[in-house]
Amino acid sequence: MAINSSGTKVLSFVRSVWQDFVNTNGFDAHVVSDIQIISAVPGFVECSLKLQKHHLNRMGNLHGGCIAALTDLGGSLALASRGLFISGVSIDMNQTFLQSGGTLGSSILLHAKCDRLGSNIAFTSVDFLTSSNEVFAKGRHTKFVRNALGDPRNCLDLAED
């Protein structure tokens, strides 16, 4: 279910963090630069992605490696929704594939959640949904955030408007 939060401080901040990913021109910018951030509230971000050829495996389905990259990105954006500009470093990440996620031209949704943000460790989860809102994969991401919490670009006082 989409959360309509257009224009909020949280959505603006999350989009600015995503723009920094793109501007850095690293891995995320090359693999999933066309992701759209639909909504964001503290602790939750919803994104969509229209699948292109470079997102697919040789069988024409969404590649598991792309789902892993999106788990990483989704976790980072969920932490951005809590005010972190830099989201720390990965400790552990896993994905569970329930069914094929889509083919060329189909759109998927990501529901990224910050399950817990502590003073050292953060836990995030991402549900991957088809355009008909069926969950086809789940991702979990644990990050070390202690150093990230001190970044001057953080906006740790984000709250819903």
UniProtKB/Swiss-Prot annotation:
Pfam families: 4HBT (PF03061). It is an enzyme of class 3 (hydrolase). It comes from the Eukaryota. One of its GO terms (molecular function) is fatty acyl-CoA hydrolase activity. GO terms for cellular component: cytosol; nucleus. One of its GO terms (biological process) is fatty acid biosynthetic process. Gene3D superfamilies: Hotdog Thioesterase. This is Putative esterase C31F10.02. It comes from Schizosaccharomyces pombe (strain 972 / ATCC 24843).
